[in-house]
Amino acid sequence: MKSFLAASVVAVATMAACATPARAAGETLTVCLDENLPPLSAHHRGKPDSGFDVALAQAIADRLGRPLRIQWFESKLDEDSSPALEANALLSDGRCALVGSYVLTRDSLVAPGVKTAKLPDFDGATRPDRTRRVPLGVLAPSQPYLYSPLTIALGPQAVEKARDRHIAGVGDLAGMRIGIESGTLADAILMTFDNGRLIDDITHLVPGRDDLLGALERGELDATLLDLRRLDAWRAAHADSRIAASGYFYPIGVNRGYVGLAGDEALLGAVNKALSDLQAAGTIASLARAAGLTFLPPREPAVLGDVWQKILGK
């Protein structure tokens, strides 16, 4: 009888172990993506969903043998929120298993300093969803799949000015009309460069209110320092744009990857395997090109340390 019971326990355990992967394989993979982050991800009424991250999420879901669902959200940061808290709230509330294109820095992955956070606005949100607070977990990253640097973009008049000189660093912008968005990383870089050498050349604009690239296009400014993704998006939306890429990338950039919750090692391990396979096959680079995104492979360190210390120390 004991032998029969032992055999039964082994059989049940074996069946459960065999059933778990099959069940996981058929389970929908839900990925949260920002609805207004072209050409990484875009979701607008009346238009098909688009972007590099949409295609990459589908490729990963295919590798895992799971159907894909995108949970779109809108990031409207205020003084009580941050990208890290928004991502954590979405994951901790079970809205998705992964958040895509997450910026991998040490600060963005530390345990939250608060116990709860509000959810960002998301597709399907109810009125109570917009006010309630979610108990937070701890974030865990995947391996990176994309490197995002800051680059110098030049307006049409600056292209003429810089024709005889190569833009090899932010110091080469001296004497140009530099536009920058207040409170951004690029603002800190330019304002502190060489003990403030560029300060008199800088005009500050308000993010979300002033049109930085529009002013550059119209010739009201000569140059700016911004996320390469934004330049890609502008040029894709304005086929006749005269804004030129300088080809210069600021030496401190960040990797992007997925982020999930600590404790979901099985999913993150499977995603990392899929990312490695897709990277080796050249698929990730191909998806980026198809989306109009300048692809730069991830760089070491995978997770950037103290950004401000690196900038102020340069």
Regions found by a protein language model. Give the residues of each.
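Extended ligand-binding regions for polar small-molecule ligands
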Residues: 54-64, 154-164, 171, 176-177, ...
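Ligand-binding clefts/hinges and TM-proximal coupling segments of bilobed small-molecule sensing domains
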Residues: 161, 165-168, 185-192, 242-244, ...
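A ligand-binding cleft/hinge motif common to bilobed small-molecule-binding domains
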Residues: 92, 100-131, 189-193, 217-252
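Ligand-binding cleft/hinge of the Venus flytrap
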Residues: 41-44, 57-73, 116-117, 156-159, ...
